[in-house]
Every structure is written in C-alpha cells, then in structure tokens.
C-alpha cells in the first residue's frame, strides 16, 4: 500500500483559530498511520504566516488555555509532496472557499466542499435564500450591511424592530456563535449590531425561533451521500443560547445522541439534511443545524461545511452512534477527496 501524505491545515486568521487547532489535534492523534503520513501546517492568526509544525508539540496556548499557532518552520506547500489537504480551518479565510481555491490552483485534492459551496455556506445571507427556494423553512429576518448601518442608522433600527423581539443578531460570515447576541428589547439592538459588525461587514438579524436544537451529519462515501443519526444539543445553566462559552469553555452543554424524537421526525431531519447539502452543491461532509418547533415544524439554521472535528465534537459523535469510529471517518474523508479528484470534473 502506498502511504499518502496528508497536510492537516489549521489555525488561520478567523475568530475560530483555537477551535481549528483543537480539531487538528484530534485528527493528528487519530489518523490511520498505516495509510497516511500526516504533516501539520499552521497558519498564524496575527499575520497569516504559514508554518510546518512539530508533530509532537505543534501548538502554543492562548490566555484562555486554548491552543494556537505561534511559530514553526516557514513552509511552501508546493515543496512538501502533499497528496491531499485536510483543511481543518473554521470560519473566514479557510471554510469560505479561500483555501479551497488555493488548492484548486495548485491541483491538490482536498477534503470537503469546493470553492463555491464553501463560500455560499459560509455566508448565511446567501445560503438562506437558496435553502428557501429548495423548500426548506428559514427564520424571518433581514440583512444589514455596514454601509447601510452607517448611512441610515435610524431606518436600520426601524426595519429590525418591525421584525419583533426577541431577535438574534449575528455576523453573516462567522461561526462558533462568535459575535452573536440574543436581543430581547429595542435598547439592546444597537450594541448587538455593532458587536456583529466588528466580526463581519454584513449582519443577519432574525426572529428568534423557539424550538429544540437538532443536528445531523452528512458523509460522502464512494460518491454516495449518507446521513448520520440525528442529535440534539441542550444548553444548561445561564446561557441564553448555544454560544461560544457553552460550546467550548464551561461545559454547560449536553447532547442527546440519538435525539429523543420520533422516527418520523428523524426521517424528516435526515431528508432535509440531504436537501440542504445538495442545494448548495456541497461535497465530502457537512453538519446541518435545525430548530424543531413544538408543532413539528423544521427550520434550518445553518450548514457547516467543515464542522468542529475534535473526538468530542458533535459531528464525530453523531457518526460514532452509527458505528463509525473517529479514525474511520477521517479515512473516509481523505479517500473521498482523492476519489473526487479522479472522477469529478472541476
């Protein structure tokens, strides 16, 4: 067997830098070394510098205790003899088509969706109209740009207020709930918009949906799409929603995998997951997040083309419940990337 060299790419310039590093730690520890030779390429957050990182101790630490890319040997991807890239980059400058485009130009296969699907999935203001046009329900809302906010603050506030409270204000292109605020009344709205605009020049303002937070994964295996079991996220304690702290810092989240929903509801979620995946033209993998309301309505929240990928992240846990180990999922994704390069016209 010819061992394939896999570049695990992590870090990056987004606000999800640390989460990317945690995902890379997980993959590095679990990748099947009888099939693959891993190397780690870290992208420093402050300046976007690329480094080849030590396999034994690749990361430094931030003040919050989470890992980060600090230093390493300067690297040129073209000289490494890489067979496939595993871009474990979450958020802008990685999950949004930028790294995918670079790999396309260099003719290197990579795990996950292509340039267009990655870019559209990252920008909720583009993804949601596509979901709606394909028969998926989305929350009522509006898009607000930085220019609109600066030029006519009063009109923007009026439009948002007309939606009714509570609202969620979030960056159009961000993840891990960074920059997201639940707004209960009008006097909280301006600060929430300013916070979201500090993460992205475009903001999504949506009516808060009351419902259970439901998630489902997709894996592409030999060109065929498969859905995982359906899971539910339950946020405990004082958190208003599934925010960054609840996800990664204070352990106030529990998961029901599989979710305690009816078989017919599970089938509905799995069908909607495939529909969302295909609507955007995704490839390889995704995690699709929904709200299931008390009357049985299913509302799509977002699709993640490179979901959190630690052993304890939702995506691997959904597949573990279906009998696929973390190591097996990693192998499937790498092999699918190589398969697509041979059989899919770009």
Regions found by a protein language model. Give the residues of each.
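ATP-dependent carboxylate activation and anion-phosphoryl transfer catalytic cores
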Residues: 2-4, 9, 260-346
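Hydrophobic beta-strand scaffold residues
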Residues: 38, 109-110, 138, 167, ...
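ATP-binding N-terminal substructure of ATP-dependent carboxylate-amine bond-forming enzymes
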Residues: 1-116, 120-122, 126, 144-158, ...
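Active-site nucleotide/adenylate-binding loops and adjacent lid/helix of ATP-dependent enzymes
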Residues: 2-10, 14, 22, 79, ...
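Short, flexible, mixed-charge acidic loops at enzyme active sites
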Residues: 54-58, 101, 241-249, 305
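Phosphate-binding site of ATP-dependent enzymes
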Residues: 184-271, 292, 297-299
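A glycine- and small-aliphatic-rich helix-loop capping segment at beta-alpha/alpha-beta transitions
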Residues: 101-110, 185-190, 321-322
């Amino acid at each position: 067997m010819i061992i394939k060299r896999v570049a695990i790419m992590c870090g990056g310039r987004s606000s999800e830098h640390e989460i990317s590093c945690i995902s890379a730690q997980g993959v590095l520890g679990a990748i099947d070394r009888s099939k693959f030779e891993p190397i780690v390429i870290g992208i420093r957050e402050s300046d976007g510098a690329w480094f080849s990182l030590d396999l034994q101790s690749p990361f430094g630490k931030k003040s919050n205790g989470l890992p980060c890319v600090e230093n390493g040997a300067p690297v040129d991807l073209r000289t490494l003899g890489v067979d496939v890239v595993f871009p474990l980059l979450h958020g802008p400058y990685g999950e949004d088509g930028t790294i995918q485009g670079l790999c396309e130009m260099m003719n290197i296969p990579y795990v996950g969706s292509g340039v267009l699907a990655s870019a559209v999935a990252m920008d909720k203001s583009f993804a949601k109209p596509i979901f709606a046009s394909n028969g998926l329900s989305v929350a009522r809302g509006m898009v607000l740009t930085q220019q609109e906010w600066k030029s006519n603050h009063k009109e923007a506030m009026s439009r948002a207020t007309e939606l009714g409270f509570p609202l969620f204000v979030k960056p159009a292109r961000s993840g891990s709930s960074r920059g997201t605020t639940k707004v209960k009344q009008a006097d909280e709205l301006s600060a929430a918009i300013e916070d979201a605009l500090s993460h992205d020049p475009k903001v999504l303002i949506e009516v808060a949906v009351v419902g259970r937070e439901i998630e489902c994964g997709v894996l592409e295996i030999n060109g065929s799409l498969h859905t995982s079991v359906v899971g539910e996220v339950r946020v405990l304690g004082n958190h208003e929603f599934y925010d960054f702290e609840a996800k990664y810092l204070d352990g106030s989240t529990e998961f029901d995998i599989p979710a305690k929903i009816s078989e017919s509801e599970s089938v509905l979620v799995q069908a909607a997951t495939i529909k969302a995946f295909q609507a955007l033209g995704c490839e390889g993998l995704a995690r699709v997040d929904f709200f299931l309301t008390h009357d049985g309505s299913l509302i799509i929240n977002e699709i993640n083309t490179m979901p959190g990928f630690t052993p304890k992240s939702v995506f691997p846990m959904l597949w573990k419940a279906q009998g696929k180990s973390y190591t097996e999922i990693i192998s499937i994704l790498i092999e699918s990337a190589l398969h697509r390069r041979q059989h899919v016209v770009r």
